A protein has these predicted regions:
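Short, well-ordered beta-strand segments enriched in hydrophobic/aromatic residues
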Residues: 34-36, 44-52
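Beta-strand-rich interaction surfaces with strong enrichment in secreted/lumenal proteins
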Residues: 33-35, 89-91, 145-151
Length: 166
């Protein structure tokens, strides 16, 4: 989806909805609906709905890619300390649907749906660190498991809600 051209379904001051009809082999019958919303000044919501109109199941492993400003390298992820200088190659961490992250005094709650693995990384090319909720991390490098599929004529929703605490 990153290199694809998405169609705008709707747009207003605080919401945008995008649509992609796949042309990739094996995904010809798949529609991707991506919705972003800013419900208030402290929240951002992203939802991806994968609609499989074909007969065969399709493999998916999506993720959202939020970058957070972080001048320093130290951050906290669910109470565990991390140093961004040591995660340049990505660390995959399982997390419950409610996650707590803190960077340089910025405190966030991230609530997810069907995204139980976080990719934690920073290439230190800028003053940011990434805490990216994913369906199964780098799962496409391994044989498929059942949770990675959207059944024929089925839908699956993935969601992320970021709430600023301080």
């Amino acid at each position: 989806g990153r290199t694809s051209t998405w169609e705008i379904r709707y747009q207003n001051e605080s919401d945008v909805g995008l649509r992609l009809i796949s042309t990739a082999k094996g995904y010809e019958n798949v529609e991707w609906l991506l919705d972003y919303s800013l419900p208030n000044e402290n929240e951002a919501v992203a939802t991806l709905t994968v609609c499989n109109y074909g007969d065969a199941p399709v493999r998916t492993s999506p993720g959202f890619h939020p970058y957070f400003p972080a001048v320093g390298t130290q951050f906290d992820f669910n109470g565990a300390p991390y140093d961004a200088d040591y995660i340049a190659h990505t660390e995959f961490v399982a997390s419950p649907s409610d996650t707590h992250v803190a960077f340089d005094g910025l405190k966030l709650d991230i609530r997810t749906q069907n995204l139980p693995v976080y990719a934690l990384w920073s290439d230190r090319n800028g003053q940011y660190t990434c805490a990216e909720p994913t369906a199964e991390g780098n799962a496409f490098l391994s044989p498929a498991r059942g949770g990675q599929f959207v059944s024929g004529h089925g839908k699956k929703r993935y969601g992320m809600k970021i709430r600023l605490i301080a």
